[in-house]
């Protein structure tokens, strides 16, 4: 009895160890350090100095690696799916024996008595299925991201991560994508709807996640018995 209990406990531990977390949706670094500035040119006595040049009418827009901007996440998703299936199958078989037949290992009287015998069989199968699925999701938040690369056409590759911990629950938001500098407002803000190749991920770790998600043992039974 003790050996069976030990085997059961070891099997449970092995199954728990087999639980693999899904890879993160946002790949790559979520921040970038600004590139080092070139060594300043020595003063040559002129009024204009190339090392300290700053355009007077240049907008303070994120155009270099290491610059930051704010992404306003406004994602609304709504899907509806309906499916109905009806299958019907009917089969039939009919045969007649009009004369006596000769069957080995049967008495002649029984074989001759089969004359005039008819065989009839029929079968039918019906299958009807119907399913409806509706999903509505709303995700509203904001995150400040860093420019990690500047493409040849001037578009900005951005990525960022924000983590907020309240008591024992930790919420993390990760975002990556490509932003057109023309879509950035004067206050360095852009909507997530204008981010190309957007990868937005939100995860919560803590007691809330433990209560909302089924345990690993329940997942095993649900995969084996989905009904």
UniProtKB/Swiss-Prot annotation:
One of its GO terms (molecular function) is cytoskeletal motor activity. Residues 1-17 form the signal peptide. Its main location: membrane. It is found in: Cell outer membrane; Bacterial flagellum basal body. It is a lipid-anchor. A lipid is attached at residue 18 (S-diacylglycerol cysteine). Keywords: Bacterial flagellum, Cell outer membrane, Lipoprotein, Membrane, Palmitate, Signal. One of its GO terms (cellular component) is bacterial-type flagellum basal body, distal rod, L ring. One of its GO terms (biological process) is bacterial-type flagellum-dependent cell motility. Assembles around the rod to form the L-ring and probably protects the motor/basal body from shearing forces during rotation. HAMAP family: FlgH. This is Flagellar L-ring protein 2. The gene is flgH2.
């Amino acid at each position: 009895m003790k050996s069976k209990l030990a085997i059961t406990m070891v099997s449970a531990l092995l199954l728990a160890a087999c639980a693999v977390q899904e890879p993160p949706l946002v790949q790559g670094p979520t921040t970038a350090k600004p590139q080092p500035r070139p060594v300043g040119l020595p003063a040559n006595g002129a009024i204009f100095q190339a090392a300290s040049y700053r355009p007077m009418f240049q907008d303070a827009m994120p155009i270099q690696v290491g610059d930051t901007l704010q992404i306003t996440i406004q994602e609304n998703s709504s899907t509806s799916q309906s499916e109905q299936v009806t299958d019907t199958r009917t089969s039939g078989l009919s045969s007649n024996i009009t004369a006596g037949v000769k069957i080995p290992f049967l008495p002649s009287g029984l074989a001759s008595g089969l004359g005039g015998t008819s065989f009839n069989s029929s079968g039918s199968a019906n299958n009807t299925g119907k399913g409806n699925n509706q999903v509505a999701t709303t995700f509203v938040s904001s995150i400040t991201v860093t420019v990690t690369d500047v493409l040849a056409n001037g578009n900005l590759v951005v990525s960022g991560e924000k983590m907020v911990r309240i008591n024992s629950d930790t919420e993390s938001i990760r975002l990556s994508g490509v932003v057109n500098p023309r879509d950035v407002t004067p206050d360095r803000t852009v909507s997530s709807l204008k981010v190309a190749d957007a990868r937005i991920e939100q995860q919560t770790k803590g007691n809330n996640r433990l209560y909302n998600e089924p345990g690993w043992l329940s997942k095993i039974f649900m995969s084996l018995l989905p009904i």
